[in-house]
Swiss-Prot record:
Active-site residues (renumbered): H96, E166
UniProt pathway: Carbohydrate biosynthesis; gluconeogenesis; Carbohydrate degradation; glycolysis; D-glyceraldehyde 3-phosphate from glycerone phosphate: step 1/1
Protein name per UniProt: Triosephosphate isomerase, cytosolic
CC per GO annotation: cytosol
Chain positions recorded as substrate binding sites: N10, K12
Organism: Hordeum vulgare
Length: 253
């Protein structure tokens, strides 16, 4: 069985109740390809998760944008994996570059978070990616492999994980890795999984692209053999997110 296309929408720290309800209405009214072809997840800020989950069409799932590395307790401001599971939130994004860079989350810490969230029954979108300086220094794969290794060393079951390659230099900048650049990193990352984890995990794990994906760029990116979907930022707040979801049809054409 092939890898089902996966499209995640990361709403980041955006929205009001009214804006979020408008986005949900747009998604509910949109014509999207069959759930047999694409798995869709949107990730609103924590405070809007119950609203979105209650009002969104059932075939679109929800994700949290982060969770704590262990069980809840005296960790002011944090949300535990157990809380998300209790709310019926199936997915969580971990290791996003904004958290790595702005909040100093290390690869080791992200690996611990991923392992803990999976152990609590959540599904995880684990993010990896290099900065512009690292790309220009020719160390893209070294960086991505190091970040992935920190996760791989802590988990055994990959069936509930998706890896999101997000070149940091292409996030929120309007710059997009060319389809060839994205395919190269995705293929190398799959090879790394094959060598360092197992051929089965490499073949079954979805590796999605996250770097200023738009309605204009999505189809050509989706056509790449090792691009199994997208983690979409700003465009997931706009009607063009429907077009990005429907790029999944490229895989089944």
């Amino acid at each position: 069985m092939g890898r089902k296309f996966f499209v995640g929408g990361n709403w980041k720290c955006n929205g009001t109740v009214e804006q979020v309800e408008a986005i949900v209405q747009t998604l509910n009214a949109g014509q999207i390809v069959s759930p047999d072809v694409v798995e869709v997840v949107v990730s609103p800020p924590y405070v809007f998760l119950p609203i979105v989950k209650a009002k969104l069409r059932p075939e679109i799932q929800v994700a949290a944008q982060n969770c704590w590395v262990k069980k809840g307790g005296a960790f002011t401001g944090e949300v535990s994996a157990e809380m998300l599971a209790n709310l019926g939130v199936p997915w969580v994004i971990l290791g996003h570059s904004e958290r790595r860079s702005l909040l100093g989350e290390s690869s080791e810490f992200v690996g611990e978070k991923v392992a803990y969230a999976l152990a609590q029954g959540l599904k995880v979108i684990a993010c990896v990616g290099e900065t512009l300086e690292q790309r220009e220094a020719g160390s893209t794969m070294e960086v991505v492999a190091e970040q992935t290794k920190a996760i791989a060393g802590k988990i055994k079951d990959w069936s509930n994980g998706v890896v999101a390659y997000e070149p940091v230099w292409a996030i929120g900048t309007g710059k997009v890795a060319t389809p060839a650049q994205a395919q190269e990193v995705h293929a190398n990352l799959r090879d790394w999984l094959k060598t360092n984890v197992s051929p089965e995990v490499a073949e079954s794990t979805r590796i999605i692209y996250g770097g200023s994906v738009t309605g204009a760029s999505c189809k050509e990116l989706a056509a790449q053999a090792d691009v199994d979907g997208f983690l979409v930022g700003g465009a997931s707040l706009k009607p063009e997110f429907i077009d990005i979801i429907n790029a999944a049809a490229v895989k089944s054409a």
